[in-house]
């Protein structure tokens, strides 16, 4: 991502006003943007995240900080920046989190820098108490889903209609993304399959212990894995139902699928085109 941004700005910085970046902790964003005299807009999900970015990097190039995008972990679609201490099933209201972010920014003399609220924004009338609010300070709002429903939007009409009929409980905040981050998406058959597949999952060790004391042999080479006694009966039942192929995950677990599904997964891993800097699904990493 850093190389792509650098090369893009080398060729087109005269027509680019600013760049935004999230999906992790983009420490190098400010350095690259400032080198070309371009504003940068980091995406964060908490005051804690911005504090780390500021102290490590952004304080050196504060003149080019155009704004801070607050992407709410529970309201925004796509990938979300939940920390290990936050419960994905217990949403927190955005106001106190943005107020905390503004308070921190004020400590760094960033009162003039706007916060851009992203996630759950549909109509400005729902956010009137945020506007001209001293606790929030300069604020702007990012519309993500609503523009998808316009006539100019190229997405299929069926998808536009689906977005207009989503009911409470039909959006899933899950951790199936190959990035390793939580992601929010409308529930569909694919997500249903992933949830069911996740339930057919057992931890394992390659060496026997008092807890992992049940041996199972996998594949033509009879590779030995050890699972908990409490999981052995589940595995026997899954195999009986046709989920006879175990596949290892980056989390040292076995997921049990059908032979057909296993073949499809392996093919998809082989066909990986490297769209991420690091992918937990295909084991691809740009640094390896």
Language model segments and positions:
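Active-site entrance/lid segments in N-terminal catalytic domains of soluble metabolic enzymes
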Residues: 1-110, 284, 288
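Conserved active-site-proximal phosphate/metal-binding subdomains
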Residues: 75-92, 104-112, 124-288
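Generic beta-sheet signal
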Residues: 43, 118, 143-144
């Amino acid at each position: 991502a850093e190389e792509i941004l650098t090369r893009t700005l080398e060729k087109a910085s005269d027509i680019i006003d600013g760049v935004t970046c999230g999906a992790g902790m983009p420490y190098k964003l400010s350095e690259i943007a400032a080198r070309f005299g371009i504003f940068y807009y980091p995406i964060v999900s908490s005051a804690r995240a911005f504090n780390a970015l500021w102290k490590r990097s952004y304080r050196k190039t504060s003149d080019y900080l155009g704004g801070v995008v607050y992407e709410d972990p529970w309201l925004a679609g796509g990938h979300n920046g939940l920390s290990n201490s936050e419960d994905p099933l217990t949403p927190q209201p955005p106001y106190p989190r943005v107020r905390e972010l503004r308070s921190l920014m004020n400590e760094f003399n960033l009162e003039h820098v706007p916060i851009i609220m992203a996630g759950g924004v549909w109509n400005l009338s729902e956010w009137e108490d945020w506007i001209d609010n001293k606790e929030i300070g300069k604020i702007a709002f990012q519309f993500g889903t609503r523009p998808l429903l316009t006539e100019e939007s190229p997405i299929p009409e069926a998808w536009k209609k689906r977005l207009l009929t989503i009911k409470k409980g039909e959006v899933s905040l899950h951790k199936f993304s190959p990035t390793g981050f939580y992601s929010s998406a409308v529930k569909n058959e694919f997500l249903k399959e992933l949830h069911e597949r996740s339930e057919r999952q057992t931890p394992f060790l390659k060496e026997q212990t008092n807890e992992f004391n049940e041996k199972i042999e996998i594949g033509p080479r009879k590779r030995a894995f050890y699972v908990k006694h409490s999981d052995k009966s589940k595995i026997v039942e899954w195999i009986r139902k046709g989920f006879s192929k175990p596949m290892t995950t980056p989390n040292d677990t076995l997921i049990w699928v059908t032979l057909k599904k296993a073949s499809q997964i392996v093919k998809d891993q082989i066909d990986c085109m490297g769209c991420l800097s690091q992918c937990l699904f295909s084991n691809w990493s740009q640094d390896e």
